Amino acid sequence: MSEVITQEYTEDGKVLRRIRSFVRREGRLTKGQEAAMKECWPTMGIDYQPELLDWQQVFGNDNPVVLEIGFGMGASLVEMAKNAPEKNFLGIEVHSPGVGACLASAREAGVTNLRVMCHDAVEVFAHMIPDNSLHTLQLFFPDPWHKKRHHKRRIVQLEFAEMVRQKLMIGSGVFHMATDWENYAEHMVEVMNQAPGFANLATDGDYVPRPDERPLTKFEQRGHRLGHGVWDIKYQRTA
């Protein structure tokens, strides 16, 4: 296992200090996940390296790129890729069993427009994602850090929003978030309303109806069972 370092923020979103946000635990891969990693990584896996990706080289075409941070076991990401062959998808997940499961599902579904990485997303963004190149960034059901004293650990902060803004296409790129914690949804809206260069795409209030392109995830199903709502939030890069 290896430690992943992220930032701690003040209330106004400025970096206070670098902290350990989580420890990357490799976990135990099932035989199927291990086989999928060995078989599919050469064609679908991208190793971390501190140089910018060339999307044409990665996918073999110039289709719009959708990037998802923290795809879990990858079921919804694979479904989205299968349902939208006209788009390219890149998923970033730090837990290798999830990456293995995603690759196994992708192989079974026969998708060819999906690539995956097993690395800290902040480092990937800083060193590998070209500016002004993403059609959509997806952040679905991130850790809510529901205790108030842990809110500063939430990934959606002003510095993160600025990092996202730089990578989205000007005038069209969309940052799509979803959470089943109302307080985190309110936090997301508060941060994004303060972040320069974004406009909320909701036509009624702060939230959009669940888009057809986002499959029903196990997290959302859990939320329904617990009586939680689910909030979808979309902001478009305007500048």
Curated annotation (Swiss-Prot):
Gene Ontology CC: tRNA methyltransferase complex
Keywords: Methyltransferase, S-adenosyl-L-methionine, Transferase, tRNA processing
Domain of life: Bacteria
Gene Ontology terms, MF aspect: tRNA (guanine(46)-N7)-methyltransferase activity
This enzyme's EC code(s): 2.1.1.33
Catalysed conversion reaction: guanosine(46) in tRNA + S-adenosyl-L-methionine = N(7)-methylguanosine(46) in tRNA + S-adenosyl-L-homocysteine
Pathway: tRNA modification; N(7)-methylguanine-tRNA biosynthesis
One GO process term, biological-process aspect: RNA (guanine-N7)-methylation
Matches recorded under Pfam families: Methyltransf_4 (PF02390)
Active site per the UniProt annotation: 143
Keyword Signal: no
Record: residues binding substrate: 147, 180, 217-220
InterPro entries: SAM-dependent_MTases_sf, tRNA_(Gua-N-7)_MeTrfase_Trmb, tRNA_methyltr_TrmB_bact
Residues involved in S-adenosyl-L-methionine binding: 68, 93, 120, 143
Family, per entry: Belongs to the class I-like SAM-binding methyltransferase superfamily. TrmB family.
Function: Catalyzes the formation of N(7)-methylguanine at position 46 (m7G46) in tRNA.
Name of the protein described by the UniProt record: tRNA (guanine-N(7)-)-methyltransferase
Encoding gene, per UniProt annotation: trmB
